[in-house]
Amino acid sequence: MGWARQPGLRTVQGVLEDALGKVLREPIQLTVAGRTDAGVHAEGQVAHFDTAAEFDGPQLVHRLARFLPKDVRVKRADVVPPDFDARFSAIRRHYVYRLTTAPYGAEPLAARSVVPCKSAVDVDAMRRASGLLLGLHDFAAFCRRREGATTVRELQRFDWERQGDLLLAHVSADAFCWSMVRSLVGAVLAVGEGRRSPEWVAGLLRETQRSSSVTVAPAHGLSLVAVDYPADDELAARNVQTREMRSAPAVEGCCGE
């Protein structure tokens, strides 16, 4: 299920707001750091809500566990400064994409979060291609266009880690536009499988619109693992800076960004 509440559909936002409403006995509206599409996971999602109610964080976490479904958990709850905004205060979002090169595919217990790929991928070539994408660029070729939204982003980390048969892509940026992370992974995986060159990936940065040659990697391999925030006394300034950078109601996150 995806994040955003939708009439008649089961979503993460919907089940969380309903559970919070039952515990706090008031309507709750969440603002989230990264809205994820259906199939994308989140291990380090951050959301905030406004309330006049007083509560103990650990006790709220314990009580929510009684109302939430097994596939949604709240791991921590804190009272934050008034200037904190889960979306606009964020300075960096971290994602991991999980692939397996095992000849038999993903382990059964990991099948919902690991995507099979070819066994003989050239990880060194993938690392070279990923390095060419780092920095402040227009990632239009990797993003699904949203009217009025910028596709300029600062890609701060994009590297690959081997753990046996597991191949992990670590991707971090100030923010991501819609489908960007999965498109980055799909493009670089094409290099690893010998279908494209690192230079082809770098050339995509010259495109001004979504490239039909870029394959979007499957949703279930992707997970939001962490969100970074500034010190409390820098929150207000960060909110203003982020709002000025976003010229339209673009959605921040990984795949529904």
From Swiss-Prot:
It comes from the Bacteria. Substrate binds at residue 95. InterPro entries: PsdUridine_synth_cat_dom_sf (IPR020103), PsdUridine_synth_TruA (IPR001406), PsdUridine_synth_TruA_a/b_dom (IPR020097), PsdUridine_synth_TruA_C (IPR020095), TruA/RsuA/RluB/E/F_N (IPR020094). Gene3D superfamilies: Pseudouridine synthase I, catalytic domain, C-terminal subdomain, Pseudouridine synthase I, catalytic domain, N-terminal subdomain. Pfam families: PseudoU_synth_1 (PF01416). Keywords: Isomerase, tRNA processing. CDD domains: PseudoU_synth_EcTruA (cd02570). GO terms for biological process: tRNA pseudouridine synthesis. The keyword tRNA processing applies. It is an enzyme of class 5 (isomerase). The active site is at residue 37. The keyword Isomerase applies. Formation of pseudouridine at positions 38, 39 and 40 in the anticodon stem and loop of transfer RNAs. Belongs to the tRNA pseudouridine synthase TruA family. Homodimer. This is tRNA pseudouridine synthase A. The gene is truA.
